[in-house]
Amino acid sequence: MRKIDPKVDEAIQTLNIKDGPTRRKLLGGAGLVSATAAASALLAACSSSSSSAAGSTIGSFPKTPAWKFYFVNHVTTNAFFTPTQYGMNDAAALLGLPNPVWSGSDNQVISQMTSAFDTAVAAGAAGIALAAISSTAFTSHVTNAMNKGIPVVTYNADGEYVNGQPQIGTNRLCYVGQSLYVSGQSMGAQIKTLVPGGGDIVIFIPQAGTGNTQPRFDGAKAALGSSYTVAEIATGAEQSVEPAAMKAYLLAHKSSLKGAFAVDAGDTQFLGPQLKSLGMSIPAGGFDTTGETVPNIQSGTLDFTIYQDPYLQGFMPVLYLYLYNISGGVLQPPDTDTGLSVITKSNVGPYVAQSRYQGSTTAEKYIQRPAGAINAPMASTST
């Protein structure tokens, strides 16, 4: 098999050249030098065309300024948000825009988040996506941005819940993320199936009171009712300290616990290994698909995890901010529930593949879905 020149391969991949005369000429043209030169010319033409406008065009969309969007996050280095960053960058590439700025705090420090938000406003951001983990801390900041004509959407967290009712606290345009209280209720339903009749259980949470995880705990506890004694154990906002805090509690209550669960990606991925290290075989589950969570579902160490699609939480805000800007504000971004899929050993198969959508690889690749019937429950909600 003839070796393909790197420049030729780059042109084919970058320009997505399908099978046809151009592709055949590049792969088997009149010699390596001419093929390489042609590939270089194609890449140069593409680069020149893209840079001649502030923002390049996709399909029949008009040329736009190079809109710079900003994402403000509460745990910027957390592995859960790796696919979120891939999603925002992929959407920007699709629309011919620069990669959004990823900023905020790496351990849920509100002052660092508001500082990052204000920096985006001062920079004249074309739009801001905010993980609003508080219903009060961001109110004036979001209002200020909106008053300056900067559209703001929230993702992953949208304020807090009080007695099961949302307290949003900002005049953002829309929320892109999971319905957090409802997802907690779903967790409660799973727990009741696994631990029938009640008893002592623990639910680990990184930091009590924050809008991204507290609603899940509250929803789960409400669904469980009085027959369960539910311990809420905070393990810390930084993933490096979570396993030790978790192990200490499990060890101290090993004889009485009937189940162990978690409301975030970090605690969930550490839960399986901690149970295994202590020789504990009790019902367990949590949220998301990071780290060892999927292998632990496969092995049966964890019974379930609830998936919320972090890739969409990066992709959709960029798309919505783009459409809002390009339409003159006519295309108002809609609230978007990114999902509540309960993953168990019986349906974990599709989540095993390495992909950008799960944050497990940087490779941009098409993943063929399984052939056959699409198994989905009967729809029960609608807008």
What does each of the following model-derived ranges do?
Residues 22-30:
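N-terminal export leaders
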